[in-house]
Amino acid sequence: MNKIVCVLALMVVMLSSCEKINILDIKTTYCTATINGEEYKDVTTVREELGRRGYPFATKGRIFIGTNNNLAYIQFQLSDANGKICYYLFGGIPFGKEENFPILNKEYQLYCHPSFDISDKPAEKIADDYLEFQAQETSSMYPSGILVLKKYSDIISSSYEMPCPLSGTLIFTEYNKKNHKYSGSFKLQNMKSSGSLSYDVKGELKVH
């Protein structure tokens, strides 16, 4: 009996000394990215995520498979070191009908054809429209994916900057069976035209 009392007393002391952690406030990092030498992160808590709005797609998932085509959609909300939201990085990656996306260590190609204009397209339609464009306008049997970088300030700022399509590669390198997350990396650049900004983007992701 005395032993049981001692054990219970010890547990009370241990519990009272532990810092209480609210599950809603646990941080999750989905993406870290360097844009022109500056570091950004898509990191959030469950509490913050519940209140966030304005994602390019009508879901808060960072990666999800389309229902009507063979497209994997990707979206990240990138903030600076002070937590200020600065960019959205979003788009889609096509994959084969028999492919179990994503395949580890496969380089998924991202390329925006110069003739494809995204200026008048809703964000959530860009990836689908680009897949259709490639089917109609190019002879490639293996369509490329597309990722777009968009300044968050565009929504509230009078100085509008066009969303910028990027080209490069994205690769998934690891799958964690415990938390069902895929890890990977990407390297992206835009095709600079007259008067446009040049972007060099690279980073890592952890998604499920």
Predicted feature locations:
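C-terminal or internal capping secondary-structure element at the end of a domain, subdomain, or sheet
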Residues: S167-H208
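N-terminal hydrophobic targeting signals that begin at the initiator methionine
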Residues: M1-N2, E19
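C-terminal motif of bacterial Sec signal peptides marking the signal peptidase cleavage site
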Residues: M14-S17
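Post-signal peptide N-terminal segment of mature Sec-exported envelope proteins
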Residues: T28-T44
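Sec-dependent signal peptide recognition
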Residues: N2-L8
